[in-house]
Structure formats: structure tokens, C-alpha cells
Amino acid sequence: MEHHHQHHRHHQRDDGEDDRQSFGVPPPHVDAPPQPHGLYQSQPHFDPYAPTPQAPAPYRSETQFEPHAPPPYRSEPYFETPAPPPSFGHVSHVGHQSPNESYPPEHHRYGGYQQPSNSLLESHGDHSGVTHVAHHSSNQPQSSSGVYHKPDENRLPDNLAGLAGRATVKVYSKAEPNYNLTIRDGKVILAPADPSDEAQHWYKDEKYSTKVKDADGHPCFALVNKATGEAMKHSVGATHPVHLIRYVPDKLDESVLWTESKDFGDGYRTIRMVNNTRLNVDAYHGDSKSGGVRDGTTIVLWDWNKGDNQLWKIFPF
């Protein structure tokens, strides 16, 4: 009887072959242990128009992705894999990033990108692109420590090294003592007194004073500008502006030598050419009748006319 019952059950499995062909895998036997879900069953045919099935719980700890999810909409090109690194000299900004990369990248964290000069770029030979070492203004001098230092405004021109340490003087006219002799735009002029203006500082170099004298026996001197290293030079004649020339201390050049006259009161004297005492240094139209001294008054040579604009004082700073 028991054998007949087992045969009957076997016969039922034969009858189920047709059902299996029509409906796929038969339900598990009631006495058989349950099979792990989703591991040993054959996958059904994928229907692209069928609703998305509920994904089974993951068996392992891998990261799960939604099956067949459409790629996200992006305003910039979408890449399945990270974009290749940019070539040297060009930086690309892509609208996505690697999961292991911080955002924003460290070298673009503060403000927009500016292409530095090639001298401030270094490539270390890796595959991460260009490394930006520093971004500096080409317009400011940099020290090795990266600290900006102003140029040494007190540094003498090279040709005046022999005059270093000597006291400087200011030169002003009796017509306007608050205006000093200075250099501006390559010309000798008068400007409001400013002791901090190096161009208003002059050296009275008397190197050849014992060798060269004027017709009255007065010793010569040169007026050398501390800021430019230029000496005031004779003009081509009366009514013409004086000139400037690079001073060469070891060269005797009469065209840069001047003398002072006798004292006309309060220490004011005329300044005239060593080889022509008739022509005097003159603040052009600086006398009161002509309008007086102003900022930018031109310095010329003129015949003596007894004006205050022809009387000068050379006084230490």
C-alpha cells in the first residue's frame, strides 16, 4: 500500500511536466527545504515595458543601484567614468566629480581661476594634471620668502657712490623760499618744499673747487641730484632752460660747474656759469611783476636784472 502511494505521487510529478512547460518553474515540494530567494532561480525574460520590479534585499554588502535607472540630466557632458586629466596649460571644469574627491578641489576653493605665468607653474610628473604652486602679481617684486618689500628709496644711483654719507642741500629762491629746486619729467623746476622728496635733495660737490674758479676768483661746484644722479648743466644761452646730464665725478666737465656771487643780503647770492658770470640761474617769470613762482616754474639762464627770482640760497637739509 505504501509503495502504491509513492508511485501515485511520482505519477503526479509526471503529469506536472506539461504545467511546468506552460508556467515555468513549479512550486517547491512541500517536503523539500525552501530555496534561497533570488539565487538559484532562472531570471525571467526582461520586458522593457513592464513596470520596474521591486529589487530583492541584497545578499551581500555591495552598493546597490536602482536597475535600469536613466542617467541624470546634466547641463554638461555626462561621463560614465571620470574624465581624463586636463593637458598642461589648460584646465577643464566638468560638472561632476569623483566620489573620493573633495568639493570644491583645493586649488579652486577660493575664487575663480586665473592662468598664472609659466614661471609660477610646476609639473611634478604625476597624472593629476597641473599643480598650481603660487599665484602672484607680476607687477610687485617678490622675495624668496614671498613677502613684498618696497624698493629702497634711499639707495643712491651707482655713479654717486663716492658721495654717500655727505649732507644734502636744498636750493630755493628769494622770490619764494617755500619752493625748492627739483627735477620733474627730466626738467629742472621749482616745486613746493617737501623734505621727503629725494628729487629736492642735491649734493654740492666741490671736488674741483681748488682747481677751477670763475673770473672773480670764486670756487666752482657742481649741483648733483640725489634721486637721479644727474648734474645741472649750462643751457645753450640766455633765456634757455638749463639741462641735465649724468654726473661723472672723476671727469672734469666745465659745463656742469657753477659759482656763487657775493652775498646780496640774508645769505642770498646769484648762481652763474663758471665760464660766463654774466648768465645767472633764473626762475622764469618768478618775480612778483611777472606773476611769481608757481609749482613747475622753469629754471633758465638770464642776464642779471637784480630780481629776487635770480637770488638763491643753498642751505643744508
Curated annotation (Swiss-Prot):
Bias (Polar residues): 136-146
Miscellaneous notes: Plants silencing EULS3 exhibit an aberrant abscisic acid-induced stomatal closure.
Gene: EULS3
Known tissue expression: Expressed in roots, rosette leaves, stems, cauline leaves and flowers.
Record's keyword terms, sorted: Cytoplasm, Lectin, Nucleus, Stress response
GO biological process: defense response to bacterium; stomatal closure
Self-association and partners: Interacts (via N-terminus) with ATS3A and ATS3B.
Record Gene3D superfamilies: 2.80.10.50
Name of this chain's protein: Ricin B-like lectin EULS3
Subcellular localization: Nucleus; Cytoplasm
Record-linked InterPro entries: Ricin_B-like_lectin_EULS3-like (IPR040249), Ricin_B-like_lectins (IPR035992)
Function: Lectin which binds carbohydrates in vitro. Interacts through its lectin domain with glycan structures containing one or more Lewis X, Lewis Y or lactosamine motifs. May play a role in abiotic stress responses. May play a role in abscisic acid-induced stomatal closure. May play a role in disease resistance against Pseudomonas syringae through its involvement in stomatal movement.
Species, as recorded: Arabidopsis thaliana
Gene Ontology CC annotations of this record: cytoplasm; Golgi apparatus; nucleus
Induction of the gene: Induced by osmotic shock and salt stress. Induced by abscisic acid (ABA). Induced by methyl jasmonate. Induced by infection with the fungal pathogen B.cinerea and the bacterial pathogen P.synrigae pv. tomato.
Spans annotated as Disordered: 1-157
Positions of the Ricin B-type lectin domain: 168-315
Gene Ontology molecular function: carbohydrate binding
